[in-house]
Amino acid sequence: MALLGLTLLALAPASNASAQLLAAKDGPIVYGHHHLNVTNLDEAKTFWVDAIGGVLIKVGPENREIIKFPNALILLRAQKPTAGSKGSTVDHIGFSVKNLRQVVDRIKAGGFRMVTSAEAPPNVKVQDDIGIVEAGPVSGIAYAMAPDETKVELVEMKAQAAPIASHHLHFFGMNKEMQAWYMQTFGASTLDSANPAAFISASLPGLTMNFSPSQAPVAGTQGRAIDHIGFEVRNLEAFTKKLEAQGIKLAAPYRQVPALGISIAFITDPWGTYIELTEGLDKIN
């Protein structure tokens, strides 16, 4: 089945998944979902649900499974990816957690790899798979490899209420140009970086976007472990016309899906990141 078809079926209105896009009320464009290609669905669900704490729900007439977190959904496509997330424009996805030690221990107990020592910024000291952070709301960071070499960062924020929530996307490539493009295209705001030596940042309601320079060429996302990222957009049809007027070509045209109460379109950023745009994802119930 085509990826577009899988996306639509996965979003069929048979659950309260919309309750997870908590930031949708806070701006015209917010983050919506990660769409992953996975070799083994059961192994993927073990990581995203049992190990890190997502909630598995079944939606639509065919009981399609998606995984929900506050401020993001994860959609899984049963297809072996062409490569992992490292080496692509979207190096990893990030979640904030209330108790990092517990999550790291569950990941290891599930047989998945912690890669904090290899992946943490060089100015972060690592002890027992956790990078020590001693200032601000973040008290620790860790990195894990989900199935199919999907890189995941976990940021400990002890003050948050939820055990886990969507936190950030981390792009690699032409970082200054990328930051400027996402700010101009999606109305993201500039944000002080949590680690200025390693990356620059921008933000949308419910999402931080970090941008690191890459010494090596990076590839686009489509077909890889993180196939595409998704933004929820108010007045999507008008937004797609605005994009076209700005010279941004639609990879798939605006389309209404009345049976699901949503609209969709796709674009690709200048560096190859495949992006789905949705309207109505925040209202599906």
Predicted regions and their residues:
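Conserved acetyl-CoA-binding loop of GNAT-fold acetyltransferases
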Residues: 50-56, 112-113, 184-191, 246-249
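Bacterial N-terminal signal peptides
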Residues: 2-13
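Mature N-terminal segment immediately following signal peptide/propeptide cleavage
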Residues: 25-61, 65-67
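Vicinal oxygen chelate
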Residues: 18-26, 29-40, 65-66, 83-171, 192-196, 200-203, ...
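Short, structured motif recognition centered on aromatic/hydrophobic residues
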Residues: 31-38, 54, 74-76, 90, ...
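Conserved active-site tyrosine of GNAT-family acetyltransferases
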Residues: 44-49, 107, 149, 178-183, ...
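Short, glycine- and small/hydrophobic-rich beta-strand elements in well-ordered beta-sheets
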Residues: 21-22, 64-69, 76, 80-83, ...
